Amino acid sequence: MTDHTPALQRPATRTARLSAIEQALLTRIVTSQSQLSQILADQGIEVTQATLSRDLDEIHATKTRLADGTVAYAVGKQNIDEHPASNPDAKTEQQISRVLSGLVTSVAAARNLVVVHTPSGAAQYVASVIDKQPIEGVLGTIAGDDTVMVICSEDDVAKRRAQWLLDVASKA
């Protein structure tokens, strides 16, 4: 399956760079700073080794030995058995299911959008959880008080993601 997600355009800011680094570590197996530097360069982000080292420290990235023996960078609570590059769907579903199971009241697709209804006051939290996961075809979210709009790259992606969100929310 080909990923039709348009490339994100990032401003040349420290915050955007940190976000790009974190996203790279969450979605790929990165074994060295030079590899990470190249990934960032491919996104138009030039960074020195010293800056990259400080950035990795700031986002609390650590080197972790994967199940196959490879040593790679990990962010947050990733562990050896849950590296997203080896099993992205299971990890993503598990994390999202914990939140969505009690907070999603309905889901509907409309063109390239998915509309998610929540109890009053929960939409911002649900949107944040969705935004933090590397979900193929999802560009981002917008949240109000009780409604989240998930912006997808294409209409058919929105239909699949709506069903997926409904399935994940129903797992409790």
UniProtKB/Swiss-Prot annotation:
Alphabetical list of InterPro entries matching this protein: Arg_repress, Arg_repress_C, Arg_repress_C_sf, Arg_repress_DNA-bd, WH-like_DNA-bd_sf, WH_DNA-bd_sf
Domain of life of the organism encoding this protein: Bacteria
Name the UniProt record assigns to this protein: Arginine repressor
What subcellular compartments does it reside in? Answer: Cytoplasm
Mention any one GO cellular component term assigned to this protein in its UniProt record.
cytoplasm
- Pathway(s) of this molecule: Amino-acid biosynthesis; L-arginine biosynthesis [regulation]
Provide any one GO MF term from the record.
arginine binding
What family does the database annotate?
Answer: Belongs to the ArgR family.
